[in-house]
């Protein structure tokens, strides 16, 4: 198959060096690229409400239940660098279409799983397919939008769509489970992937690096062996605390990661060009993306707990209310695009961090009787600032690399966000738990029974449960603490 880059619709004027501007076809193609992006993002969170139904039908063990949740994210994160590099070599649209077909088949397999083992295998297959889709979409945007302003807008839309998918996952899951069986949360992927398979060959251009070299199989194995143990260890520490096995897992991943970097430095055709990290703009932007995702995911954990455990909302109602802060991202995206046309990106990014910090500071003032609007407003401010930072970071990263290296650069972006999310849950989760327990030790009513106080110290949900079993006044005082 001949590989080429489809010319943009409106070429630059003769006699100028201005890059060609994208036309209607490219913008329609962007809409097509958002389909897999939304679905892959939603599959991270779509199982939140389905677990009770899956447990009833498939009867998984506690270990199997954890793997049903986590195997998708582990495999996805571990293969992002591999798939970004593979797309540079075999063609990004080709990899996208292969991934879409595989995602559809894996979704069917997950929906009709007859055992926990089958569902775990299907979720792993979804992770493999998802890893082909995420870097392909961002890399193709780099190839489709050559004009800097248009590319900035397209990447901002891509960034907002990623976060929207994560927020929409629980809502879609809740709505489907109200009317259908648990397999419907996977079947919903199929028609959208079929639409992608039909439309992408017409609307999305093919591109592959002309001199990418041979695929580095050993480097691929090393990247998988580096990412998965580190994310596994971090997530386990966030869930159950520190122990030797989890620390060894992280250490092993870091050692393999060092071996991966050594190989990339010596390889003739590396999966990641380490020279990119000599650019302060590229390295700083990757760090910005990681920090922003670190903060977003860590804050989301507390917000969800507050809505359900403190305000007493049902999971679906909490998920619906959690969509309200997305208004902040809808406002932030176009405002950020306009600001960077007139103000240095560094100042806009700093402003985004400052806005996110203000929202976070407001969230620290929440208490048991805070009105819902206060939480949603603070969360919207926080999300808007963080999304502004991520949009700028992604645009700087993709603008800093030539089109031939866009796939590898997109994989770096995705891997950084995966690490940021995992570390955010672990670090902010641990800090939050420590602050919660410290505050409860000081403010808990003296009359609280020792056993009840121990349960309350364990989790916020435990405190709510215990408070409901105590005498009215004592229970209210415990919740207030």
Predicted regions and their residues:
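Helix-breaking motifs and short loop linkers at transmembrane-helix boundaries and internal kinks
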Residues: 59, 91, 112-118, 180-181, ...
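Extracellular/periplasmic helix-loop-helix junction of adjacent transmembrane segments
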Residues: 50-78, 118, 316-320
